[in-house]
């Protein structure tokens, strides 16, 4: 079963192909896009060990010469050091502008490789082959590329659209359960921000998705990508509606920053927590019903995701430190705080100039000090 979803960006439009067996048929999808039959595959050591040879063989069978660059797994790779190392290795290979880079991995590999492609010789084409649920439904689509800095997540980056996204659902079979739950956080986000019917379907099918039922994954990934593709086509540079895709991310990134962007708290877990907090803060501000917030929280918790600060660690967080992280958020303008809040499940909006004292009081209620 193959589903193709177009991302309509005029001359830079591309397809997101979703289905099974796509890695083994990667050559037939990728070879026609190449000016010169040469690619560099960037992958981490874990994905490379499990699937790298399959992808390289599929490409070579289509007459494409391949080089493989291995990077360490984990968020720490998305750094200035990681970017410099990858850029140097691409230069050492002598890649030309007519060649292609393939990001074969999760969100970290996709973000890092996409940014390196954006700046390599002022821009080289790249393809996303996402290997995690989170990357398939979110980070591989839309052209956002970035690295982290000690001051925050994804603060240095560029918009650089891929030429193609291949989302092979078979590869999710080897994904650890924790990573699958992290991806589910981004799936349920789409229902919470703008599709109540999809949210209801997820309530009823969360276990089918997490048990990797193929039909459930086709629906979950397909609807998520449809929504993201539509929003990106309307607002590529996030000057308007695309900001809604950050539901849960401002709260979540703040907690990630305090936790050091490591494996103690993964990005999807932070987003799950952040969405629950966004609903509760919306209730506190008189924007959303407590019933909707409780229902959203229950749906997030059903996937085994954290919904409270105390789920992350027993020691309390500093409210002031969390607020300082939100001030570094990319949505912030004129020194004010900007959050994606909700009126109801399926009805999110961008709230500008959020009151710092109200936010601090809320975080104290949440257990911060």
From Swiss-Prot:
- Which BP terms from GO are recorded? amino acid biosynthetic process; aromatic amino acid family biosynthetic process; chorismate biosynthetic process
Superkingdom is Bacteria
> What does the entry list as the binding residues for Zn(2+)?
186, 249, 267
Which molecular-function annotations from GO does this UniProt entry contain?
3-dehydroquinate synthase activity; metal ion binding; nucleotide binding
CDD domains, alphabetized: DHQS
Q: How is the cofactor bound?
A: Binds 1 divalent metal cation per subunit. Can use either Co(2+) or Zn(2+).
The protein here is known as: 3-dehydroquinate synthase
Q: What organism is recorded for this protein?
A: Caulobacter sp. (strain K31)
């Amino acid at each position: 079963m193959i589903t193709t979803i177009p991302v309509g960006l005029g001359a830079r439009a591309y397809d997101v192909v979703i289905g099974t067996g796509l890695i083994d048929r990667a050559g037939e999808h990728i070879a026609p896009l190449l000016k010169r039959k040469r690619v560099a595959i960037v992958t981490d050591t874990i994905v490379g060990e499990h699937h790298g040879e399959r992808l390289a063989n599929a490409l070579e069978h289509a007459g494409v010469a391949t080089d493989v660059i291995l990077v360490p797994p984990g968020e720490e790779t998305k750094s200035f050091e990681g970017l410099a190392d990858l850029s140097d290795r691409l230069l050492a290979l002598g890649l030309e502008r007519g060649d292609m880079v393939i990001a074969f991995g999760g969100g970290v590999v996709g973000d890092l490789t996409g940014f390196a492609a954006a700046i390599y010789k002022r821009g080289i084409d790249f393809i996303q082959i996402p290997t995690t649920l989170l990357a398939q439904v979110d980070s591989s689509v839309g052209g956002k590329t970035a690295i982290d800095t000690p001051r925050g997540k994804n603060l240095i980056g560029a918009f650089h659209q891929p030429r193609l996204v291949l989302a092979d659902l078979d590869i999710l079979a080897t994904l650890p359960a924790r990573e699958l739950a992290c991806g589910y956080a981004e799936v349920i986000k789409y229902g919470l921000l703008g599709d109540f019917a999809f949210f209801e379907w997820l309530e009823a099918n969360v276990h089918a998705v997490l048990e990797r039922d193929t039909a459930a994954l086709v629906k979950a990934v397909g609807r998520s990508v449809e929504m993201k593709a539509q929003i990106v086509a309307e607002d590529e540079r996030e000057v308007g509606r695309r900001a809604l895709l950050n539901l849960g991310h401002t709260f979540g990134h703040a907690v990630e920053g305090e936790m050091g962007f490591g494996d103690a708290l993964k990005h999807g877990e932070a987003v799950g927590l952040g969405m629950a907090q966004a609903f509760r803060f919306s209730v506190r501000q008189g924007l959303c019903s407590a019933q909707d917030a409780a229902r959203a929280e229950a749906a997030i918790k059903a996937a085994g995701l954290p919904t409270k600060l105390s789920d992350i660690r027993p020691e309390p967080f500093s409210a002031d430190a969390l607020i300082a992280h939100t001030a570094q958020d990319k949505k912030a303008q004129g020194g004010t705080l900007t959050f994606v809040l909700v009126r109801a499940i399926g009805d999110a909006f961008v709230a500008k100039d959020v009151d710092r004292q109200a936010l601090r009081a809320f975080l104290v209620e949440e257990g911060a000090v």
